[in-house]
């Protein structure tokens, strides 16, 4: 859910986001977003609204987590902060628990991030025992777009290591609430705020008949749950048998585009190892099963067909086109699993990928076939598999750049004889030359052909299931140097989960070759701007 704003102002130490021509402000309160109108507003535009995630339970049918937070608030003496049994528990109560009895309204304002150090709550949220605490991020501010974005599922990271977990989606629900009044501490906080905010001058001819409505863009087709907090006549008369949205907003449902490709990481899990384990396990099922499973929407079903086209473009029929990760086939890793591993790497580095679509397919499939989730494959085996691919592409990048820098006019090296390898060697020579600012136009024809032949020899070894060791061995021979051995040692230390420069280089070389194969295979990669 996206909230547009035009400007910001700091008042009483809190950032307020101005919208609706100065008639309304947003501010962050414990990871939730409160929308407050200018005093003396009309009944239509004077609604106080609260948007945010609420706590639910371990499954969709229980309220274990919400009840636990209520009991902890009462146990620690925060009775006034404990919602009644009829009300949902917003995530802002987590911040009250974390800060203790001394927490005041201003202390809880200003951030989308919440700290959770209660071991039981942490385990409920990520289905793992966590001793170092969690950081729960409920949204983000995008200043360049003037937009506040609330997540439907939070991003959860380890407070100590920064490890990104897969959230238990049953634990959270996005809710809009109507407030009859603000708590006294927040009333004090905003006192005098609107005296500092000028009202935009209305046009001479106002055809709208009142205040302009504020756009809130709902980016998910699932409706936001609505609830009322308080017992005023106005709220009690509101027909809440169906989901409605505040009178002061205009809701625009933006359907998700059919394109599966994106240039940013938009997965709910943040591309964690846990999500990769699940996708690695069920990749073949979610793509190759012929009939759509119950609950699979049309967009995701179309995505399966697009993914099949992409896999055929990259690996060919029955995987006959060789590519990175060929060594993994000896361990029983399928073509689809290798494709998932590649998309994971591209997503990690915000290169064009379809990992989010794959994860949505997995979530939909598990919703229909829950027994397909367990047991997950060994995390070490999955990590080793994805690390093999990033290391192969990493050593390729390093060796290509050395070859274009230091190739001498010696006897030419025999090429591989493979049309695909020779074509990609020519592309890689140009790509590596651009990366190292080497002017191929200044080299002779024979020197350039020699570069391409040497790159083809390295590429052929990688594609022939010999891995980084085989690539280094042939590179030592054609370069007449032991430098590739040192490169192997460096490459062996990188992983698909780190942020090292060598890992970035591997991701970019992987992306370049994969995108060229998609292009040659007739797969259009259209990135939707969200």
Swiss-Prot record:
Coiled-coil segments: none
Cellular location(s): Virion tegument; Host cytoplasm; Host nucleus
Gene Ontology CC annotation, any one: host cell cytoplasm
Record carries keyword Isomerase: no
Alphabetical UniProt keywords: Host cytoplasm, Host nucleus, Virion, Virion tegument
Family: Belongs to the alphaherpesvirinae UL21 protein family.
Task of the protein: May participate in DNA packaging/capsid maturation events. Promotes efficient incorporation of tegument proteins UL46, UL49, and US3 homologs into virions. May also play a role in capsid transport to the trans-Golgi network (TGN).
Record Pfam families: Herpes_UL21 (PF03252)
Protein name: Tegument protein UL21 homolog
UniProt keyword Signal, yes or no: no
Quaternary structure annotation from Swiss-Prot or TrEMBL: Interacts (via C-terminus) with UL16.
InterPro entries for this protein: Herpes_UL21 (IPR004936)
């Amino acid at each position: 859910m996206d909230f547009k704003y035009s400007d910001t102002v700091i008042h009483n130490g809190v950032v307020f986001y101005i919208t609706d021509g100065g008639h309304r402000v947003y501010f962050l309160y414990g990871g939730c977003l409160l929308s407050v109108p200018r005093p003396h507003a009309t009944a239509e535009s004077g609604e106080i609204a609260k948007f945010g995630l609420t706590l639910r339970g371990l499954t969709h049918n229980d309220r274990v987590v919400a009840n636990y937070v209520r009991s902890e608030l009462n146990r620690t003496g925060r009775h006034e902060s404990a919602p009644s049994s009829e009300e949902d528990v917003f995530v802002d109560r987590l911040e009250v628990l974390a800060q203790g009895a001394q927490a005041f309204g201003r202390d809880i304002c200003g951030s989308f991030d919440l700290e959770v150090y209660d071991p039981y709550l942490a385990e409920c949220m990520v289905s793992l025992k966590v001793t170092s605490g969690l950081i729960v991020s409920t949204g983000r501010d995008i200043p360049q777009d003037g937009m506040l974005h609330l997540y439907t599922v939070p991003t959860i990271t380890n407070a100590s290591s920064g490890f990104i977990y897969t959230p238990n989606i049953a634990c959270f629900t996005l809710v809009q609430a109507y407030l009859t009044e603000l708590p006294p501490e927040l009333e004090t906080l905003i006192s005098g705020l609107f005296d500092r905010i000028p009202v935009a001058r209305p046009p001479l001819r106002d055809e709208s008949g009142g205040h302009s409505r504020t756009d809130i863009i709902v980016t998910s087709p699932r409706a936001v749950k609505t609830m009322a907090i308080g017992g005023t006549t106005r709220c009690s008369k509101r027909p809440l048998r169906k989901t409605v949205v505040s009178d002061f907003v205009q809701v625009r449902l933006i359907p998700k585009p059919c394109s599966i490709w994106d240039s940013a990481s938009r997965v709910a899990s943040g591309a964690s190892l846990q999500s990769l384990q699940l996708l690695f396990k069920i990749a073949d099922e979610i793509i190759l099963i012929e009939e759509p499973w119950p609950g699979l929407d049309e967009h995701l079903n179309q995505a399966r067909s697009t993914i099949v086209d992409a896999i055929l473009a990259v690996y060919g029929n029955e995987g006959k086109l060789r590519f990175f990760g060929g060594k993994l086939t000896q361990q029983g890793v399928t073509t689809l699993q290798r494709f998932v591993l590649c998309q994971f790497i591209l997503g990690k580095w915000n290169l064009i990928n379809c990992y989010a679509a794959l994860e949505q397919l997995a979530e939909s499939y598990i919703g229909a076939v829950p027994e397909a989730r367990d047991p997950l494959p060994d995390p070490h085996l999955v990590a080793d598999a994805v690390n093999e691919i990033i290391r192969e592409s990493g050593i390729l990048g390093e060796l290509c750049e050395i070859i274009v820098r230091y190739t001498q006019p010696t006897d030419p090296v025999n090429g591989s004889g493979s049309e695909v390898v020779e074509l990609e060697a020519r592309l890689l020579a140009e790509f590596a030359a651009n990366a190292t600012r080497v002017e191929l136009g200044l080299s002779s024809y024979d020197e350039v052909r020699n570069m391409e032949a040497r790159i083809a020899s390295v590429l052929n070894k990688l594609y022939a299931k010999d891995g980084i060791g085989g690539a280094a061995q042939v590179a030592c021979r054609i370069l007449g140097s032991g430098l590739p051995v040192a490169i192997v040692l460096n490459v062996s230390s990188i992983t698909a989960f780190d942020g090292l420069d060598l890992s970035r280089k591997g991701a970019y070389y992987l992306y370049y070759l994969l995108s060229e194969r998609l292009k040659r295979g007739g797969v259009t990669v259209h990135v939707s701007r969200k």
